[in-house]
A protein has these predicted regions:
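Short, basic/glycine-rich phosphate-binding loops at helix/coil junctions
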Residues: 48-61, 109, 131, 195-203
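Hydrophobic C-terminal alpha-helix "anchor/cap" residues
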Residues: 33-36, 130, 224, 256
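Residue-level signal for inorganic ion chemistry
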Residues: 14, 42-44, 68, 102, ...
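Conserved, helical-rich catalytic subdomain that frames metal- and/or nucleotide-binding sites
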Residues: 142, 146-229, 242-281
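ATP-binding N-lobe of GHMP and related small-molecule kinases
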Residues: 1-96, 115, 119-124, 151, ...
Length: 281
């Protein structure tokens, strides 16, 4: 095998509770990660030298800080692999939307090159490597909808009803660092257990602050809540609502304000990347 095409799916935070601040400055979180069946796509072509090249449908994303390049080089360095690759990233998810696109791209790169380079690393090893790139990367490496704790890296897989979601992203880029450093951020939500999950009140502790700092997020939520209960994912700017069926979601999408991007996706308990990898066996 010399080529491989794999999806890099989005996620939603069905809730995001901040339960405290750690000594290292990071925050302890509890969240429910819902994987979606929609996202970016990556095309890998193996090279017989050690060069790693990236091209992207959005040329502005091709730089040394891109998580795809960082993931590929990390894997190469960790294993001493003498192969390289050409990677094409078809970027479909909005940047800075709270949908995990960059982390998902990194995870798919680790999974894809582990296969293409025939490295044979375990999922645990790939998840550990991924954590050094970002707290959400292990979620996408493991590829299961999960209840998460810690900084988001302690994952317990969970099966949820696979609902239809409308995801809407207003025209703004929320700074995650600004949100988590802000003195007004809620940081004392009471911890819940997995057993308490369905009897607890779900909310996003970042949402009140983000709505204040980025009024367009509040306006977008006010629009979406006309159709279904709505909330923000991650630190925004994307917001979402669950719908009973595709038709009702399409009706709302047809009324989308011109300043927003939107898409409909289905929640899935296992990432499509696993089916795509299995198809290469």
């Amino acid at each position: 095998m010399t080529t491989l095409t794999l999806p890099a799916v989005a996620k939603l935070n069905l809730f995001l509770h901040i339960t405290g601040r750690r000594a290292d400055g990071y925050h302890n979180l509890q969240t429910l990660f819902q994987l979606l069946d929609t996202g970016d796509e990556l095309h890998f072509t193996r090279r017989n030298d050690t060069n790693i090249n990236l091209s992207c449908s959005d040329a502005s994303l091709v730089n040394e800080q891109n998580l795809v390049l960082r993931a590929a080089r990390l894997l190469q360095q960790h294993t001493g692999c003498k192969l390289g690759c050409d990677i094409v990233l078809d970027k479909r998810l909005p940047m800075g939307g709270g949908l995990g696109g960059g982390s998902s791209d990194a995870a798919t790169t680790l999974l894809g090159l582990n296969k293409l380079w025939q490295l044979g690393l375990s999922i645990d090893t790939l998840a550990e490597l991924g954590l050094s790139l970002g707290a959400d990367v292990p979620l996408f490496v493991r590829g299961q909808t999960s209840f998460a704790e810690g900084v988001g890296e302690k994952l317990q897989p969970i099966n949820l009803a696979e609902k239809v979601y409308l995801v809407v992203t207003p025209d703004c880029h929320v700074s995650t660092a600004e949100v988590f450093q802000h003195p007004d951020l809620i940081r004392d939500t009471k911890e819940i257990s997995l057993a308490d999950l369905h009897s607890s009140s779900w909310h996003n502790d970042c949402q009140p602050l983000v709505e204040r700092l980025y009024p367009i997020v509040a306006i977008t939520l006010q629009w979406l809540v006309q159709y279904a209960p709505s909330q923000m994912t991650g630190t925004g700017a994307s917001v979402f609502a669950a719908f009973p069926d595709q038709t009702s979601a399409q009706h709302a999408l047809a009324q989308l304000p011109p300043s927003c991007r939107g898409f409909i996706a289905k929640g899935v308990n296992q990432s499509p990347v696993w089916a795509a990898l299995a198809d290469t066996e």
